[in-house]
A protein has these predicted regions:
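Bacterial N-terminal signal peptides
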Residues: 5-18
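N-terminal secretory signal peptides that target proteins for export/translocation
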Residues: 1-2
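C-terminal helical cap and adjacent loop that interface with cofactors, partners, or active-site loops
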Residues: 402
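Formylglycine-dependent sulfatase
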Residues: 16, 22-397, 405-416
Length: 416
């Protein structure tokens, strides 16, 4: 009899716990992040008529895009340091590309907070955090990680990362261009040559490929009947993989596409300016993503996080500036800091004796870099194209994005 009573009590407790778990799951959104690599907001929804990105464009049409979003770092690993921690990498020791340092004692990566709150957290599959992981971070993190592997009814946080637009893919040959190289807009800092046009056209082709990947993930969510329960983010990890974008903390290296969608059920968690088909001028950067995802899950972001939640239960006030940085990039050291208010970009070069265009083997594998440098050496580059290679570089730079989106007219010495 005693055994039967114990079993009955256990069954009641289990049923009660199951009901609580189901209730909690119903009160918390699923969160899906679809990410890509090395691309700026060169997408149709951002007004780029040369781009072919129908899936992200459709997401933006029913959601909202951010026009002033920065990565913090113009290269992948430090950018991911920022994302996973909610901290600026210079404050953690992970500023340099391919670092491996621990977080301070007691600090955690944001998926650990989510898992403690009952979320199933999957990452498919790039990590590259520049940080030593403080224990188990994900429920699964590999090429098979998927929200489908969670317990039935469990809320999920899932990342799917596409590498198809990575810098290395811009220069892969042979490549049959889908986007016509003749129709490329070549930025003022690049020479207008067939090699440069080919690289830019191939870059746009690769952005179309990651858009197709995004479409597959969105369809999978819809087919599973989960679209109405899931908050979606689409973003890239930093600016384009073209030279003078990737690795440089100016707008071309830091500005990223960020598109979000909040279904009706979770619209109360959206930023106040959120509306279907809208565009926000709020300044956000990657340091804000960790506190934001915790806030969306109903978790108070820890005080040590340096970012500010822009949505969810614990929103912070809008910020007047966002910040970027550059440290060692592969085999070349540098020290640069940058800031923007959305219109002006200020850059402080602490090592002006080093040119912007220091020789990085990985970057010189891109045809654009080689032909650009050769034209500079032969004296055939324009003034705007020569700035990148000159020594010394200006200690301070100031650009007005409204009149100079390519950031080639330095206003730092202007009396105005």
């Amino acid at each position: 009899m005693t055994r039967l009573l114990c079993l009955a009590a256990l069954a009641l407790f289990t049923n009660h716990f199951s009901l609580i778990t189901s209730s909690q799951a119903a009160d918390r959104p699923n969160i899906l992040w679809i990410t890509s690599e090395d691309h700026s907001p060169n997408m149709g929804c951002y007004g780029d008529k040369f781009a072919s990105t129908p899936n992200v464009d459709a997401l933006a049409a029913r959601g909202m895009l951010f026009r002033r979003a920065w990565s913090c770092a113009p290269v992948c690993a430090p950018a991911r340091t920022t994302l996973i921690s909610g901290l600026y990498p210079p404050s953690t020791g992970a500023e340099h590309m391919r670092s491996m340092v621990p977080l301070p004692v007691g600090f955690k990566m944001y998926p650990q907070f989510l898992r403690e709150a009952g979320y199933y957290c999957s990452n498919n599959s790039k990590e590259d955090y520049n940080l030593a992981k403080p224990g188990q971070v994900w429920d699964e993190s590999n090429g098979k990680a998927h929200w489908k592997n969670r317990t039935a009814g469990q809320p999920f946080f899932a990342i799917f990362n596409s590498t198809k637009s990575h810098e290395s893919q811009i220069r892969t040959r042979p490549h049959i261009a889908v986007h016509d190289p003749a129709k490329v807009r070549v930025p003022a800092y690049h020479p207008d040559t067939p090699e440069v046009r080919q690289d830019w056209a191939q870059y746009y082709d690769k952005v179309s490929e990651v858009d197709a990947d995004a479409g597959r993930h969105l369809k999978e969510l819809t087919d599973a009947g989960l679209a109405d329960d899931t908050i979606i983010f689409y973003y890239a990890d930093h600016g384009s993989g073209m030279p003078r974008s990737k690795r440089w903390p100016c707008n071309s290296g830091l500005q990223v596409p960020v598109v979000v969608h909040f279904p009706a059920k979770w619209k109360h968690l959206a930023p106040p300016e959120y509306k279907a088909g809208g565009a926000s001028d709020r300044l956000i950067s990657f340091v804000d993503f960790a506190p934001t995802v915790l806030s969306l899950a109903g978790i108070q972001p820890p005080a040590w996080m340096q970012g500010h939640a822009f949505a969810g239960k614990f929103p912070a006030p809008m910020q007047p500036f966002i910040f970027g940085f550059r440290g060692r990039m592969d085999e070349r050291i540098d020290c640069v800091r940058s800031a923007t208010d959305g219109r002006y970009v200020y850059v402080r070069n602490f090592m002006p004796h080093l040119s912007q265009g220091q020789h990085v083997d990985y970057q010189f594998a891109t045809p654009t870099t080689r032909v650009w440098f050769d034209l500079f050496k032969s004296g055939k580059a324009t003034e705007a194209q020569s700035i990148f290679w000159r020594v010394p570089k200006a200690p301070e730079e100031l650009y007005d994005l409204t009149t100079d989106p390519d950031e080639v007219k330095n206003l730092a010495a202007s009396p105005q």
